[in-house]
C-alpha cells in the first residue's frame, strides 16, 4: 500500500466521514441527515403546536373590533368566509354568512347557469333598492308568476308593459285564493295608478311612503312612468335585524364564487360577473401553477375593475409571491390541512398551516395583499391563531358544514342528527351528485381522467354533527376570537397579527384540553375529537 509524504494512505483508500470535507475542515452535521442542510426546508407548525401568549390588556372582548380585509378593497365586519364546497356553500349559506358580517363563496360543482343563478339569488335577497327587479307582463299566467316568485323567493312582482312602463303589481294577496293558474296577470293584479316614488328618493322618504300608505312594496319610476327600481319594507327590517351585514354600494349582500382553470372556466367566470358576483376565487389545490397564474392575471386585466380576484391554494412563500405578481387581490393558503382532505397522505405534499400562513404573509404583507387561511380550523381558538399568524380572514368548512344553512344531506344515526360533509377531492364530489356531471375534477387537475374508475381521490366523504342555525355557530366563533383579542390586548385584528406564540409539547396540548374529568354537559363551542 503506497503512502504519501505525510505518511497517510493514498486518498483513494480513505473512507471519508460525512462531517469532514476533503480539505480536512470539519463541518457541522446536518440534523436531519444527509449532506444538504437545505433539504429539509424548515420546521412545520400547525394550530395544535402553538398557543397565543397573553399580554397586558385594557381590551374588553365585547368592544374588540373584528373587522378585517378580505381582499384589497373588501372589508368584512366578521373575518369569516364559508368554503367553496358543495356540502358547505350554496345561496342559502352565502346569504346567511353575509348577513352575519362575513361572506360565502359559492362552490363550482354545478352547471354554469346554476351557479350564476345562485349569485343572483344572493344579490336579490335584499337591497336598499332593487335596481333591476324581477317583473312580469299582463299576459303572463299566474302559474308563471308563481314559478318566478318561488325561484327568487319573493312574494310579488311589478307588472310592466312592452315599454317598461308600470301598469300594476301582483302579490301573494292577489293570488292566494285563485284556483285557476291559467288566468292572466291582468285579470288579478292591482292596477295602476299605484303608490310610487320618483328616481333618487331617499331611504327616509321611501320608508315614510311605505309607513303612511301601509304598503310593503314601493315601485320606483322615472319621469315617463317606467319602472326603474323597487323598494320593499322587508329590506328595512332586514337592515335592522342584521346590522353587521356585508353589503355593496347598492345595499345588496356581497357574495363570492369559485372558478377553475380548465374547460368552461372562462365562460363560467364571465357569467358570474354578469350575474353580479363581487369576488371570483380561482380555486385549485395547487395555485403555484402556470395555468392558475395566467387565469388570475387574465381576470384582473379583463374584469378586475368589476370584481376582486382571489388566487389559491398555496403553502409556500414563493407561491404566494407568484400570485401577488399575477395581480391577486388576496391569496388563499392551505394545502391539505382540511379534515376531509387526504392530499398530504396521498401525495405526500403540503405544509402545516401555521407555518404556511407565516410564509405566505411574508410575501403578501409588503404588497398589501391580504391572506385567507383556508382549512384545519377546529375550534374558535384556531381562528385566533390563524389571524395572529398574519391571515386577515379565515375560510371555514367543517365548522359550518353541520349548520342548517349548509346544503349537505341531513342524516339520522342512532337518534342523533348529522349532516353529510365531503372533500371536493373525494370520489363522490369528482363523480358528481346524483349522477350529475362533476365540475370539481379540474381543481385537482384531474379533468383528463378517462373514466371515473381512473380518478385518484384526495379527499374523503363523511358526516359532522348537526349544529343548528348558522347564527349561533358564528356567535360562538366570533366570541372565541373576541376572547383571544382580550387576552392578547388586541383592540383590532391588525394588532392581533402582532401577537406572539409559544410552542408547546404534546403534554402541553393535552393540558390545554379538558382532562382528568368526564364531561357531563356539552358546551356549544367545544367537543372532544
From Swiss-Prot:
K(+) binds at residues 336, 338, 341, 511-513. Pathway: Purine metabolism; XMP biosynthesis via de novo pathway; XMP from IMP: step 1/1. GO terms for cellular component: peptidoglycan-based cell wall; plasma membrane. SMART domains: CBS, IMPDH. The active site is at residues 341, 443. It is an enzyme of class 1 (oxidoreductase). Its EC number is 1.1.1.205. Catalyzes the conversion of inosine 5'-phosphate (IMP) to xanthosine 5'-phosphate (XMP), the first committed and rate-limiting step in the de novo synthesis of guanine nucleotides, and therefore plays an important role in the regulation of cell growth. Does not catalyze the reverse reaction, i.e. the conversion of XMP to IMP. Appears to be essential for the optimal growth of M.tuberculosis. Belongs to the IMPDH/GMPR family. This is Inosine-5'-monophosphate dehydrogenase. It comes from Mycobacterium tuberculosis (strain ATCC 25618 / H37Rv).
Amino acid at each position: 500500500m503506497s503512502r504519501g509524504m505525510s505518511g497517510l494512505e493514498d486518498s483513494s483508500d480513505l473512507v471519508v466521514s460525512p462531517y469532514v470535507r476533503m480539505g480536512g475542515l470539519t463541518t457541522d452535521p446536518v440534523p436531519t441527515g444527509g449532506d444538504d442542510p437545505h433539504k429539509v426546508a424548515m420546521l412545520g407548525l400547525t394550530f395544535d403546536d402553538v398557543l397565543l401568549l397573553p399580554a397586558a390588556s385594557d381590551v374588553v372582548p365585547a368592544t374588540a373590533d373584528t373587522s378585517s380585509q378580505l381582499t384589497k378593497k373588501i372589508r368584512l365586519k366578521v373575518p369569516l368566509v364559508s368554503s367553496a364546497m358543495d356540502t358547505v356553500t350554496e345561496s342559502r349559506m352565502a346569504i346567511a354568512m353575509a348577513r352575519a358580517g362575513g361572506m360565502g363563496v359559492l362552490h363550482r360543482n354545478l352547471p354554469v347557469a346554476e351557479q350564476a343563478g345562485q349569485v343572483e339569488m344572493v344579490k336579490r335577497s335584499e337591497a336598499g333598492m332593487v335596481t333591476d327587479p324581477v317583473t312580469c307582463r299582463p299576459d303572463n299566467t299566474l302559474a308563471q308568476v308563481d314559478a318566478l316568485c318561488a325561484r327568487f323567493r319573493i312574494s310579488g312582482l311589478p307588472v310592466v308593459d312592452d315599454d317598461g312602463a308600470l301598469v300594476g303589481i301582483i302579490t301573494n294577496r292577489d293570488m292566494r285564493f285563485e284556483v285557476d293558474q291559467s288566468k292572466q296577470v291582468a285579470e288579478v293584479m292591482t292596477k295602476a295608478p299605484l303608490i310610487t316614488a320618483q328616481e333618487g328618493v331617499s331611504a327616509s322618504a321611501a320608508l315614510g311612503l311605505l309607513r303612511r300608505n301601509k304598503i310593503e312594496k314601493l315601485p320606483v319610476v322615472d319621469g315617463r312612468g317606467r319602472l326603474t327600481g323597487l323598494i320593499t319594507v322587508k329590506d328595512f327590517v332586514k337592515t335592522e335585524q342584521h346590522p353587521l351585514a356585508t353589503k355593496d354600494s347598492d345595499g345588496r349582500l356581497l357574495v363570492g364564487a369559485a372558478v377553475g382553470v380548465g374547460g368552461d372556466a372562462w365562460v363560467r367566470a364571465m357569467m358570474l360577473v354578469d350575474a353580479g358576483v363581487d369576488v371570483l376565487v380561482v380555486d385549485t389545490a395547487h395555485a403555484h401553477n402556470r395555468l392558475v397564474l395566467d387565469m388570475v392575471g387574465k381576470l384582473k386585466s379583463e374584469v378586475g375593475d368589476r370584481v376582486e380576484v382571489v388566487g389559491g391554494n398555496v403553502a409556500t412563500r414563493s407561491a404566494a409571491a407568484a400570485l401577488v405578481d399575477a395581480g391577486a387581490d388576496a391569496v388563499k393558503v392551505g394545502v391539505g390541512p382540511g379534515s376531509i382532505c387526504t392530499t398530504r397522505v396521498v401525495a405526500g405534499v403540503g405544509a402545516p398551516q401555521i407555518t404556511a400562513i407565516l410564509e405566505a404573509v411574508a410575501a403578501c404583507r409588503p404588497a398589501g395583499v391580504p391572506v385567507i387561511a383556508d382549512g384545519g380550523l377546529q375550534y374558535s381558538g384556531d381562528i385566533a391563531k390563524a389571524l395572529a399568524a398574519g391571515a386577515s380572514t379565515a375560510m371555514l368548512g367543517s365548522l359550518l358544514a353541520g349548520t342548517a344553512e349548509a346544503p349537505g344531506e341531513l342524516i339520522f344515526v342512532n337518534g342523533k342528527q348529522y349532516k353529510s360533509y365531503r372533500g371536493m377531492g373525494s370520489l363522490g364530489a369528482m363523480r358528481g351528485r346524483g349522477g350529475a356531471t362533476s365540475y370539481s375534477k379540474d381543481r385537482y387537475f384531474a379533468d383528463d381522467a378517462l373514466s371515473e374508475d381512473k380518478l385518484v381521490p384526495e379527499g374523503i366523504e363523511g358526516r359532522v354533527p348537526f349544529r343548528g342555525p348558522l347564527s349561533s355557530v358564528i356567535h360562538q366563533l366570533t366570541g372565541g376570537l373576541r376572547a383571544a383579542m382580550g387576552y392578547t390586548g388586541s383592540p383590532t385584528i391588525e394588532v392581533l397579527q402582532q401577537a406572539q406564540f409559544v410552542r408547546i409539547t404534546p403534554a402541553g396540548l393535552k393540558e390545554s384540553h379538558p382532562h382528568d374529568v368526564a364531561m357531563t354537559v356539552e358546551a356549544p363551542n367545544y367537543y372532544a375529537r
